[in-house]
UniProtKB/Swiss-Prot annotation:
Single annotated GO MF: zinc ion binding
Keyword Metal-binding applies: yes
Tissue: Expressed in the cerebrum and cerebellum.
Listed Basic residues bias regions: 384-399
Annotated Basic and acidic residues bias: 445-460
InterPro entries xref list: PNMA, PNMA_C, PNMA_N, Znf_CCHC
One Pfam family it belongs to: PNMA
Taxonomic lineage from the root: Eukaryota, Metazoa, Chordata, Craniata, Vertebrata
Protein name: Paraneoplastic antigen Ma3 homolog
Gene designation: Pnma3
Gene Ontology CC annotation, any one: nucleolus
Length: 466
C-alpha cells in the first residue's frame, strides 16, 4: 500500500511524515533534469523541498521518489497527480489529523449535497424535536446517510489515532526527540486512552521507537513474541530511566536544600517527593517519618528565628507535625509576610529603586550581612566560641576581664541597606530611594570599626603569664 510505504520510508530516514510525500509512477527512462523540472512546476506553491531518495517498484515497473518539504503544507493544496513523462504521477501524502480538516471536508460534502447540519441531525435522529421513531426517512435520504457514513468513518479513525512521540535512547540529543521521563509519561497516558487490542498498541509503540530503544524491544520480542506493552515500557525504563537505588535516594533527600528564590512551602513539597522515593527504596525508616522530615527542613530551609524555635521545640518534644500541617504552617507564614510587604510596597510605589544586589562590588559583598529578621534567621558569630574559651581561661588563671568598653559589651550587628543606607533591612527588600552618600559613610564607619572587641585583642595582645 503506498501510504504504508511512505510511513516505512520516513521511519527509516527519521523524517516527519506530515512534511513528506511519495511520488509514484515515474518511468525509468525519465532523466533527473526532466524529473526535477516537472516536480518544480507542480510543487513550487508549497515552498522549498528536497529529494531524499528513489527506489524501483516491481509491481508498477516504475520508480518511486521520496520528497521532504521544508515546512508544513496545506493538505488541500497538494496535487493528487502530476502530469509528467509516461503519464500522470501519483502523489501520496499522509492525511492530517486535525479537527479543522475534518470539519472542512464535512462542510464541503454538505455544500455539494446542498444540505445543512440540521438536515443531518434530522436524518440521523439526533435533533431534540424529532424522535427517530417518528421520522420517516426517504430512500434518497437513506442513500445520502450511507454515503455520509462512508465518508466520515475513515476520517473519524484518523482523528482518534495520534502518533506517539519519537524516542531513540541515544545519549546525544537529537532535535525533535524527548527525554525518557517525558516520553514515558506521554506514552503511558496515550496507551491508556486507546481502546484498541494489545497487538495494535504494541505496533504503535514500535512505530515511535528508534535506534537503541528499538533494538531493546526487538530483542524482547525475539525472546517472547507475546510480550505486552506494559512489559516493554518497564524494560525501557530499566534501560534508559534514571538510576535511583537505595543509596542515591538517601543522598538526594539528605542533601536537599532550599534553592534561591524558592518558597519554604515549595521546598517542603519538593522534599516530600524525595522522602517518598527514599521510603520506597527502604533508605529511610518509616517509624519516625515526621521526625525525619522536620529534621531535614530545619537543616535545609531558611526560616525566621521565631519559626525555627517553634519547630525545634516540637522536635525536642517528639511531636513533629505531618506533611500537610507543615505546608499549611509555612503558607500561612508566607501569606502573612506577603500581606505585610504588600502594604509597605504600596506606600513606596513610583519611587526609584537602587541597583540590584548582583551589581554590588566585592568590597560591599564582604559587609553584606543578610539579617532581615522576618525572612532570614540571625546566625551566631563564629568567633563567639573562641571568646568564650578565652574568658574561661582567664578566670582559671585569675585574670581580670576587661571593662565593658573593650570586650564584655553586648554583641550587636550593624546591618544596613546598600541601596538607601537605612538600618533594619537589606537591599533585596528595599523600596526606598537610593542614597549612595549615606551608604558610603556607613561603609567607611564599619571598616574603621573593624571586628570590634576581638580586633582590639589581636592588635593589643596581653603578655603571657609565667
Amino acid at each position: 500500500m503506498p501510504l504504508n510505504l511512505l510511513q516505512d520510508w520516513c521511519r527509516g530516514e527519521h523524517l516527519n511524515t506530515q512534511r513528506s510525500m511519495l511520488i509514484l509512477g515515474i518511468p525509468e527512462d525519465c532523466s533527473e533534469d526532466e524529473f526535477e523540472e516537472t516536480l518544480h512546476e507542480a510543487l513550487k506553491h508549497l515552498g522549498r523541498y528536497r529529494i531524499i531518495g528513489r527506489m524501483f517498484r516491481r509491481e508498477e515497473n516504475a520508480q518511486a521518489f521520496l520528497v521532504e518539504l521544508a515546512r508544513d503544507f496545506d493538505y488541500a493544496l497538494v496535487p493528487r497527480e502530476i502530469e509528467g513523462k509516461g503519464g500522470p504521477w501519483e502523489v501520496v501524502v499522509k492525511p492530517p489529523h486535525s479537527d479543522d480538516e475534518f470539519l472542512n471536508r464535512l462542510n464541503h460534502f454538505l455544500e455539494e449535497e446542498r444540505r445543512t447540519v440540521s438536515d443531518m441531525n434530522r436524518v440521523l435522529g439526533t435533533h431534540s424535536n424529532h424522535s427517530p421513531t417518528k421520522t420517516t426517512i426517504s430512500a434518497d435520504f437513506w442513500v445520502w446517510a450511507q454515503t455520509l457514513g462512508a465518508v466520515m468513518q475513515p476520517l473519524l479513525e484518523q482523528m482518534l489515532y495520534r502518533e506517539l512521540r519519537v524516542f531513540s535512547g541515544n545519549t546525544i540529543s537529537i532535535p525533535g526527540l524527548l527525554a525518557f521521563d517525558s516520553w514515558l509519561e506521554h506514552t503511558t497516558e496515550m496507551l491508556q486512552m486507546w481502546q484498541v487490542p494489545e497487538v495494535e498498541k504494541r505496533r504503535r509503540l514500535m512505530e515511535c521507537l528508534r535506534g537503541p530503544a528499538l533494538q531493546v524491544v526487538n530483542v524482547l520480542r525475539a525472546n517472547n513474541a507475546a510480550i505486552t506493552v506494559k512489559e516493554c515500557l518497564e524494560a525501557l525504563r530499566q534501560v534508559f530511566g534514571s538510576v535511583d537505588n537505595r543509596k542515591i535516594a538517601q543522598l538526594k533527600f539528605c542533601k536537599a536544600y532550599q534553592e534561591p528564590g524558592e518558597k519554604v512551602s515549595s521546598f517542603v513539597v519538593r522534599l516530600e517527593t524525595l522522602l517518598q522515593k527514599a521510603l520506597e527504596k527502604n533508605a529511610i525508616s518509616r517509624k519516625n517519618v515526621n521526625q525525619t522530615r522536620l529534621k531535614r527542613i530545619l537543616g535545609g530551609a531558611i526560616l525566621s528565628a521565631k519559626l525555627r524555635e517553634k519547630l525545634k521545640m516540637l522536635k525536642q518534644r517528639r511531636r513533629p507535625p505531618g506533611f500537610l500541617a507543615l505546608v499549611k504552617l509555612f503558607r500561612e507564614e508566607e501569606e502573612e509576610w506577603e500581606a505585610t510587604r504588600g502594604s509597605e510596597r504600596s506606600c513606596y510605589e513610583g519611587l526609584e529603586l537602587g541597583p540590584s544586589p548582583s551589581n554590588i562590588g566585592s568590597e560591599e559583598r564582604e559587609l553584606f550581612v543578610p539579617a532581615f529578621g522576618s525572612v532570614l534567621e540571625e546566625r551566631p558569630y563564629q568567633g563567639s566560641r573562641r571568646r568564650r574559651h578565652r574568658r574561661r581561661g582567664q578566670h582559671r588563671k585569675g585574670g581580670v576581664p576587661r571593662d565593658d568598653s573593650q570586650g564584655t559589651r553586648k554583641q550587636n550587628y550593624d546591618t544596613f541597606c546598600y541601596s538607601c543606607g537605612e538600618d533594619g533591612h537589606i537591599r533585596v527588600h528595599c523600596f526606598n530611594p537610593s542614597n549612595r552618600t549615606l551608604v558610603k559613610q556607613k561603609r567607611q564607619a564599619a571598616m574603621e570599626k573593624g571586628n570590634r572587641s576581638w580586633a582590639w585583642e589581636k592588635s593589643h595582645p596581653k603578655p603571657k603569664t609565667k
